[in-house]
Amino acid sequence: MYGNYSHFMKFPTGFGGSPGHTGSTSMSPSVALPTGKPMDSHPSYTDTPVSAPRTLSAVGTPLNALGSPYRVITSAMGPPSGALAAPPGINLVVPPSSQLNVVNSVSSSEDIKPLPGLPGIGNMNYPSTSPGSLVKHICAICGDRSSGKHYGVYSCEGCKGFFKRTIRKDLIYTCRDNKDCLIDKRQRNRCQYCRYQKCLVMGMKREAVQEERQRSRERAESEAECASTGHEDMPVERILEAELAVEPKTESYGDMSVESSTNDPVTNICHAADKQLFTLVEWAKRIPHFSDLTLEDQVILLRAGWNELLIASFSHRSVSVQDGILLATGLHVHRSSAHSAGVGSIFDRVLTELVSKMKDMRMDKSELGCLRAIVLFNPDAKGLSNPSEVETLREKVYATLEAYTKQKYPEQPGRFAKLLLRLPALRSIGLKCLEHLFFFKLIGDTPIDTFLMEMLETPLQIT
């Protein structure tokens, strides 16, 4: 294979076993030369003698402590071309290379042979890969590609699932042949008896499946216990009590087809909202753990969510109204009046995205209260001193609402999700109301922080 190698490689004087060779030599092979061309017409290569191995600078120099990391980094990066040039003041140790010694000891092209474990001369600097590092595990049962070690044996997902089902359901199989069926990738489903027996023979453990099932049961019980703790900490009964406590005390809403003629719809809505804002603080104080927060955080949460909280209330109150909304004052605002007042677009969204959806799913007051509590406990409200505590309270309300819907409406597994889907619409409509100054008369000249602070400092009135 290397018989003609001498025609393409020119070794300089003093290389290998020639008389001019003394000690270690730094060399570079010349380029291939055409036969018959004199060497004088090409660049010459000179031997550069290397002295004894050099060490790093003496202890005490600033760079001495960085010597070892510097060598590692430069070795990993490697020089772009040629030999590595050591920076001034640093002497790098030139480690002896067994591969370099092998090359230097060659005296002729016939003596050049590939190094053991290497595919050829060209890959001299790359160590061979160990055979074990490329081995891929196969399923011990059917020979398919293994997805890992399952129940003590490397197996594929198919055999893993088969064994687990067999153990968990305590299945019993029979073989139609002689109990020696071939189990491979193509025929593994042919005989369940022989497949199961092979699982056992190859080392799959029944107890591993049983332990896995026990861990799953314990995990489910733990999650249920945590959820139960959340329900006890945020009982839906108290949330419902808060809703009922602030319900407008009007015996009758009167004729819902007639609305006040003294004011325009926007004024009526603002007046009703102004009255409801006082009861909103009373409602929030009745929600479990809200009063445990700092007074400043209570103000921030109410300031961040008052518009959504009020919109949710009058939307749910309006499910019995045809094409309009019912205010806490007992006044009914029709769609046509809202359009004539210039707030028709946002009014239509309230009817379509909130009132209509609440009516279709027959949202009850407990669910409404939970949704409002979720809005109230907003951990993203700016300025909170302890947002993580607020987030924990919100998660407890989530758990309470989910448990309530599962217990009250077991035939509607998707009800919890449908309830939560009203929250983005409520947020969007609330922001739009502020954008249109929908409640511009609500506060007047009083800053909202001071306004809410005065109400929060008022003792809770039990009625």
From Swiss-Prot:
GO terms for cellular component: cytoplasm; RNA polymerase II transcription regulator complex. Residues 139-204 bind DNA. A zinc finger (NR C4-type) spans 139-159, 175-199. It comes from Rattus norvegicus (Rat). Belongs to the nuclear hormone receptor family. NR2 subfamily. SUPFAM superfamilies: Glucocorticoid receptor-like (DNA-binding domain), Nuclear receptor ligand-binding domain. Composed of three domains: a modulating N-terminal domain, a DNA-binding domain and a C-terminal ligand-binding domain. This is Retinoic acid receptor RXR-gamma. GO terms for biological process: cell differentiation; cellular response to hormone stimulus; heart development; nervous system development; neuron differentiation; peripheral nervous system development; positive regulation of transcription by RNA polymerase II; regulation of myelination. Residues 16-53 are annotated as: Disordered. Homodimer. Heterodimer with a RAR molecule. Binds DNA preferentially as a RAR/RXR heterodimer. Interacts with RARA. It is found in: Nucleus; Cytoplasm.
